[in-house]
Amino acid sequence: MRPNNRANNQVREIKITRNYTRYAEGSVLIEFGETKVLCNATVEESVPRFLKGQQQGWVTAEYGMLPRATHSRTQREAAKGKQGGRTMEIQRLIARSLRAVVDLKALGERTVTVDCDVIQADGGTRTASITGACVALYDAMNKLVANGTLKTNPMKGLVAAISVGIVAGEAVCDLEYLEDSNAETDMNVVMVQDGRLVEVQGTAEGEPFSHQELLTLLDLAKQGISQLVEAQRKALAE
């Protein structure tokens, strides 16, 4: 029996609150059950040095966890003087996922940075970050259209992400922390709205998984992501 009696292909309750903070061009609080992430998108009228003169924009991301997002206090990375490898890996994943749905040429020579700050962690923080960041980015792009900076929104669609895994011999979708910490196989899947893959990160924590189990997990991820995309569309329509 899963936590909260969820079916194996059922995601947690998803809540997307737009315009959550005052100043960011796009601001979203996303909740995957008890996992809560604040995603703020900022537009800057410049690009990184390697893109100067290329007539295109850039989308990047930063990721962090508040000290008491977890069961016990985690020291701020700023206090340590450097980012951890996990943090850098996750923020690069978020940025790659977002760029998959943006026409960077249409964005022009400007940069959008999406800051994803985990307020509370109960598994799936990177997948919640990607899903919420997409909505925040969409809102930021719409503001560029509304103020006349851009003629059309340069986003080509929506992107979302979900965790899947094998827990107690069963393939399940959208793992909570308790499930994640006991998973025999743990996988994060990123897809665009039509089901095409952006990234798959999968690891066997114990017993290796079979090719058939991989296909089962990818199918489960597609079912979960379709639920997330529907939640994104519903939020953007409000």
Swiss-Prot record:
PROSITE patterns: RIBONUCLEASE_PH (PS01277). InterPro entries: ExoRNase_PH_dom1, ExoRNase_PH_dom2, ExoRNase_PH_dom2_sf, PNPase/RNase_PH_dom_sf, Ribosomal_Su5_D2-typ_SF, RNase_PH, RNase_PH_bac-type, RNase_PH_CS. One of its GO terms (molecular function) is 3'-5'-RNA exonuclease activity. Phosphate binds at residues 86, 124-126. Keywords: Nucleotidyltransferase, RNA-binding, rRNA processing, Transferase, tRNA processing, tRNA-binding. SUPFAM superfamilies: Ribonuclease PH domain 2-like (SSF55666), Ribosomal protein S5 domain 2-like (SSF54211). Its EC number is 2.7.7.56. Phosphorolytic 3'-5' exoribonuclease that plays an important role in tRNA 3'-end maturation. Removes nucleotide residues following the 3'-CCA terminus of tRNAs; can also add nucleotides to the ends of RNA molecules by using nucleoside diphosphates as substrates, but this may not be physiologically important. Probably plays a role in initiation of 16S rRNA degradation (leading to ribosome degradation) during starvation. PANTHER family: EXOSOME COMPLEX COMPONENT, EXOSOME COMPLEX COMPONENT RRP41. Homohexameric ring arranged as a trimer of dimers. This is Ribonuclease PH. It comes from Mannheimia haemolytica. The lineage of its organism: Bacteria, Pseudomonadati, Pseudomonadota, Gammaproteobacteria, Pasteurellales. The gene is rph.
